[in-house]
C-alpha cells in the first residue's frame, strides 16, 4: 500500500501537536519552582528579550541574560516589557530567578486570537515595520490591515517592500506607484532586497534609533532581513509553499535583538492573518489617517460610508482626495471583520 503524502499544512499541524504534547510532558515532569524570600536577592530592573511558554529571558543593566520564572499573579509577559525581577542565590533546574512585576507599558501591539481573546505580542515599541514582498504578490489590503493596527496602537509605521531584486523595470514602476499611495498620506516606504543588498543601508540607518518590530506574513523575508542585519543570529528562513503561495513559519518565539549600529529589533513569529474583529467599525475607520479630515461631515450622523447619500468619504474619493484603492480596502476590512466575528461566535458555541 502506497504511503499517503502529507500536505504542508498537515505536516505543520502534526509538528505543532507534537510540540504541544512535549510541552505538556515537560510541565508535568518539571514542577514549577516555589521561590521563597530567602532564596532570592534584591529586586532589580530588566528587559524581557525572549518569551517562552513557561519562562522569559531577562536582560539586566549589564547586558547579562537570565532565564526566569513568572509570578502567577502577573498578566501576560511579552518581549519588550520592562520588568522588576530577582535573581536566585543559586540556579534551580536551569532557572536563574523570577519576574516579580511588569512596569507600565508605553504601548503594545496585539492581535486577536479565536481562543485566547486579544493576545499582546510585544511592548514599548518606537516603530512598526510592515514587511511585504513581491513574492507572495504585494497586497495593499494586507498593508492596510497592519496600518489600522498601527494607527489604533498609536505607533508609527514604515512600509517595507522586500525582494525587489525580482522585479522587472515595469514591475518596479508599478510597485513605486502603489507605494506612492502611502507616501502621499505621510507614511515612509522603502524598497529593498536582502539578497542584493539594495537600500539595506537605509534600513539599518532607520533601525539605529529606538526599538522597531518586524511584522508581516510568512514568506516575505523577515528572517532573511535579520540574517543580513545580524548575520551571527542565523535566523531560520523558509520557502514559499507551492500550493498556497504563502511562506512556511520559521520563527517560533518573539525575540529582541540589539543592533551593532544602535537601536533594537524585535522579531515576531510570522502572522498569516492579522484579524480586526476585536476592533469596532469606528476604530477601523479611524485607522485610515486620510479619512480624519472628512469624518463628521457626512449628511447623516450614522453614515456607514458605503452607498449612503451625502457620504463625505465617498465624495472625497470622487474628488481625488482619498485614493479609491484605500477606500475599497476599507470596505473589505469592515466586511471581513463581520465575517470573522461571526466565525468566532460559532467557534465559541462549539467550545461551550
Swiss-Prot record:
<comment type="similarity">
    <text>Belongs to the TRAFAC class YlqF/YawG GTPase family. RsgA subfamily.</text>
</comment>
<dbReference type="GO" id="GO:0003924">
    <property type="term" value="F:GTPase activity"/>
</dbReference>
<dbReference type="InterPro" id="IPR030378">
    <property type="entry name" value="G_CP_dom"/>
</dbReference>
<feature type="binding site">
    <location>
        <begin position="162"/>
        <end position="165"/>
    </location>
    <ligand>
        <name>GTP</name>
    </ligand>
</feature>
<comment type="function">
    <text>One of several proteins that assist in the late maturation steps of the functional core of the 30S ribosomal subunit. Helps release RbfA from mature subunits. May play a role in the assembly of ribosomal proteins into the subunit. Circularly permuted GTPase that catalyzes slow GTP hydrolysis, GTPase activity is stimulated by the 30S ribosomal subunit.</text>
</comment>
<dbReference type="InterPro" id="IPR010914">
    <property type="entry name" value="RsgA_GTPase_dom"/>
</dbReference>
<feature type="binding site">
    <location>
        <position position="311"/>
    </location>
    <ligand>
        <name>Zn(2+)</name>
    </ligand>
</feature>
<keyword id="KW-0342">GTP-binding</keyword>
<keyword id="KW-0547">Nucleotide-binding</keyword>
<feature type="binding site">
    <location>
        <position position="305"/>
    </location>
    <ligand>
        <name>Zn(2+)</name>
    </ligand>
</feature>
<dbReference type="InterPro" id="IPR004881">
    <property type="entry name" value="Ribosome_biogen_GTPase_RsgA"/>
</dbReference>
<keyword id="KW-0862">Zinc</keyword>
<dbReference type="InterPro" id="IPR027417">
    <property type="entry name" value="P-loop_NTPase"/>
</dbReference>
<keyword id="KW-0963">Cytoplasm</keyword>
<dbReference type="Pfam" id="PF03193">
    <property type="entry name" value="RsgA_GTPase"/>
</dbReference>
<keyword id="KW-0690">Ribosome biogenesis</keyword>
<feature type="binding site">
    <location>
        <begin position="216"/>
        <end position="224"/>
    </location>
    <ligand>
        <name>GTP</name>
    </ligand>
</feature>
<feature type="domain" description="CP-type G">
    <location>
        <begin position="106"/>
        <end position="274"/>
    </location>
</feature>
<dbReference type="GO" id="GO:0005525">
    <property type="term" value="F:GTP binding"/>
</dbReference>
<feature type="compositionally biased region" description="Basic residues">
    <location>
        <begin position="1"/>
        <end position="15"/>
    </location>
</feature>
<keyword id="KW-0479">Metal-binding</keyword>
<keyword id="KW-0378">Hydrolase</keyword>
<keyword id="KW-0699">rRNA-binding</keyword>
<feature type="binding site">
    <location>
        <position position="298"/>
    </location>
    <ligand>
        <name>Zn(2+)</name>
    </ligand>
</feature>
<dbReference type="GO" id="GO:0019843">
    <property type="term" value="F:rRNA binding"/>
</dbReference>
<feature type="binding site">
    <location>
        <position position="303"/>
    </location>
    <ligand>
        <name>Zn(2+)</name>
    </ligand>
</feature>
<feature type="region of interest" description="Disordered">
    <location>
        <begin position="1"/>
        <end position="26"/>
    </location>
</feature>
<protein>
    <recommendedName>
        <fullName>Small ribosomal subunit biogenesis GTPase RsgA</fullName>
        <ecNumber>3.6.1.-</ecNumber>
    </recommendedName>
</protein>
<dbReference type="GO" id="GO:0042274">
    <property type="term" value="P:ribosomal small subunit biogenesis"/>
</dbReference>
<dbReference type="GO" id="GO:0046872">
    <property type="term" value="F:metal ion binding"/>
</dbReference>
<dbReference type="GO" id="GO:0005737">
    <property type="term" value="C:cytoplasm"/>
</dbReference>
<dbReference type="InterPro" id="IPR012340">
    <property type="entry name" value="NA-bd_OB-fold"/>
</dbReference>
<keyword id="KW-0694">RNA-binding</keyword>
<comment type="subunit">
    <text>Monomer. Associates with 30S ribosomal subunit, binds 16S rRNA.</text>
</comment>
Amino acid at each position: 500500500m502506497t504511503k499517503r503524502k502529507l500536505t504542508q499544512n498537515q505536516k505543520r499541524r502534526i509538528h505543532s501537536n507534537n510540540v504541544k504534547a512535549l510541552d505538556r510532558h515537560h510541565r508535568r515532569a518539571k514542577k514549577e519552582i516555589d521561590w521563597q524570600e530567602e532564596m532570592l536577592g534584591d529586586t532589580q530592573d530588566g528587559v524581557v528579550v525572549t518569551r517562552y511558554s513557561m519562562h522569559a529571558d531577562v536582560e539586566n543593566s549589564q547586558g547579562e541574560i537570565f532565564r526566569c520564572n513568572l509570578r502567577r499573579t502577573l498578566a501576560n509577559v511579552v518581549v519588550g516589557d520592562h520588568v522588576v525581577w530577582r535573581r536566585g542565590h543559586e540556579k534551580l533546574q536551569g532557572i536563574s530567578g523570577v519576574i516579580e512585576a511588569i512596569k507600565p507599558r508605553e504601548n503594545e501591539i496585539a492581535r486577536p486570537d479565536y481562543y485566547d481573546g486579544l493576545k499582546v505580542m510585544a511592548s514599548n515599541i518606537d516603530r512598526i515595520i510592515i514587511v511585504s514582498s513581491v513574492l507572495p504578490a504585494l497586497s495593499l489590503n494586507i498593508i492596510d490591515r497592519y496600518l489600522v493596527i498601527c494607527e489604533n496602537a498609536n505607533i508609527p509605521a514604515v512600509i517595507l517592500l522586500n525582494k525587489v531584486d525580482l522585479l522587472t523595470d515595469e514591475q518596479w514602476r508599478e510597485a513605486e506607484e502603489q507605494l506612492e499611495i502611502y507616501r502621499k498620506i505621510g507614511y515612509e516606504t522603502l524598497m529593498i532586497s536582502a539578497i542584493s543588498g539594495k537600500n539595506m543601508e537605509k534600513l539599518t540607518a532607520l533601525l539605529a534609533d529606538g526599538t522597531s518590530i518586524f511584522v508581516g506574513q510568512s514568506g516575505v523575508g523577515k528572517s532573511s532581513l535579520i540574517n543580513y542585519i545580524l548575520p551571527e543570529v542565523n535566523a531560520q528562513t523558509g520557502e514559499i509553499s507551492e500550493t498556497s503561495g504563502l511562506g512556511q513559519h520559521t520563527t517560533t518565539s518573539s525575540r529582541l535583538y540589539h543592533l551593532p549600529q544602535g537601536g533594537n529589533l524585535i522579531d515576531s513569529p510570522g502572522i498569516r492573518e492579522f484579524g480586526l474583529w476585536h476592533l469596532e467599525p469606528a476604530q477601523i475607520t479611524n485607522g485610515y489617517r486620510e479619512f480624519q479630515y472628512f469624518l463628521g461631515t457626512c449628511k447623516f450622523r450614522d453614515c456607514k460610508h458605503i452607498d449612503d447619500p451625502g457620504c463625505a468619504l465617498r465624495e472625497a474619493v470622487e474628488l481625488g482626495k482619498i485614493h479609491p484603492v484605500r477606500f475599497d480596502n476599507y470596505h473589505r476590512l469592515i466586511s471581513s471583520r463581520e465575517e470573522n466575528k461571526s466565525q468566532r461566535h460559532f467557534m465559541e458555541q462549539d467550545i461551550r
